[in-house]
Amino acid sequence: MSNNLLLPDKNSRMQREQWKWTRMTLTRAHYKQDNKQCQHWRINSQTTREEWQMLCPGRKWILNLLTRLGLNLMIISRRDQALDMEMSLM
């Protein structure tokens, strides 16, 4: 097997794509009727202590984590909920 088959092409999308770290807040997550999880995100315009802040490089990682936790409905708005969730993710 050639090594060229294992390495991505120099012009591939994967190499051109760069991670952008954006401060996001997960405001709601729930399951749809087809058992697919739906997440509601928003970009933080300002940092407050009343919101759960997270650095999210992509939604797929957190989707998988929340699915493994058995999440079916979550609304994060109060500080105590945010702290509970933050502790469970550690």
UniProtKB/Swiss-Prot annotation:
Name where it's found. Host cytoplasm, Host perinuclear region; Host cytoplasm
Q: Name one GO biological process term.
A: symbiont-mediated suppression of host innate immune response
Q: Which GO terms describe its cellular component?
A: host cell perinuclear region of cytoplasm
Keyword Hydrolase among UniProt keywords? no
> What's the main place this protein lives?
host cell
Q: Quick check: keyword Transmembrane in the entry?
A: no
Query: Which keywords fit this entry according to its UniProt record?
Result: Host cytoplasm, Host-virus interaction, Inhibition of host innate immune response by virus, Inhibition of host RLR pathway by virus, Viral immunoevasion
Protein family according to the UniProt entry: Belongs to the hantavirus NS-S protein family.
Q: What else is known?
A: Expressed from the S segment by a leaky scanning mechanism.
Q: What this chain does, per the record?
A: Antagonizes host type-I IFN signaling pathway.
* Record's protein name: Non-structural protein NS-S
Q: Which gene encodes it?
A: N
